[in-house]
Amino acid sequence: MSAITITDAAHDYLADLLSKQNTPGIGIRIFITQPGTQYAETCIAYCKPGEEKPDDTAVGLKSFTAYLDAVSVPFLEDALVDYATDRMGGQLTIKAPNAKVPMVNEDSPINERINYYLQTEINPGLASHGGQVSLVDVVDDGIAVLQFGGGCQGCGQADVTLKEGIERTLLERIPELKGVRDVTDHSQKENAYY
């Protein structure tokens, strides 16, 4: 299995759950909702025969078949499904380190590339101040319209962050981008960092 690893403990736990469904041929389907976004969630669901999608990748395991959602496969790279016992019985865990990482290249639409750099380079730094920035739109032939949130909304340094940090980074990474514009209502200062 190249994209995802299912440990023996997880396999045995899932096989036991599946056997209790009294459905011959039942397997699991692994998919990510909203892959490549900050809202991505990795999911495992029962998959009765016929419920798999035509473009799913079928992975035959010892006791059952795991179906991997085609759109999710790149985001499942290096994912791990494990089962650990504890005092309460045990817990199935899914770790998918690439689930929230946008998959973009030079040919991706400009909004996807902007979101990629916001998620991977800009927001991790802003998070230390309890803030984040998101893309609202791309207008006027290459102007990124951004909105601050959290500790950045109302912050006295937002303008400096926008021009010296965010705009500079985005212009270096995305040559056809012409600039950025902030549409945040900075009069709301109750959560502001500065």
UniProtKB/Swiss-Prot annotation:
User: One Pfam family, short name please?
Assistant: NifU
Please list the coiled coil stretches. none
Q: How is the cofactor bound?
A: Binds 1 [4Fe-4S] cluster per subunit. The cluster is presumably bound at the interface of two monomers.
Database matches in HAMAP family: Fe_S_biogen_NfuA (MF_01637)
Which Gene3D superfamilies does the entry link to?
Answer: Fe-S cluster assembly (FSCA) (3.30.300.130), HesB-like domain (2.60.300.12)
**Which residues are listed for [4Fe-4S] cluster binding in this entry?**
C152, C155
Query: What is the name of the protein in this document?
Result: Fe/S biogenesis protein NfuA
Its quaternary organisation is: Homodimer.
* Swiss-Prot/TrEMBL cofactor(s): [4Fe-4S] cluster
What job does the chain carry out? Involved in iron-sulfur cluster biogenesis. Binds a 4Fe-4S cluster, can transfer this cluster to apoproteins, and thereby intervenes in the maturation of Fe/S proteins. Could also act as a scaffold/chaperone for damaged Fe/S proteins.
Gene Ontology process terms (BP):
iron-sulfur cluster assembly; protein maturation
What family is it from?
Belongs to the NfuA family.
Give the Gene Ontology MF terms in alphabetical order. Answer: 4 iron, 4 sulfur cluster binding; iron ion binding
What InterPro entries does the annotation carry? Fe/S_biogenesis_protein_NfuA, FeS_biogenesis, FSCA_dom_sf, HesB-like_dom_sf, NIF_FeS_clus_asmbl_NifU_C
User: Keywords of this protein's UniProt record, alphabetized?
Assistant: 4Fe-4S, Iron, Iron-sulfur, Metal-binding
What gene name is given for the protein in this entry? nfuA
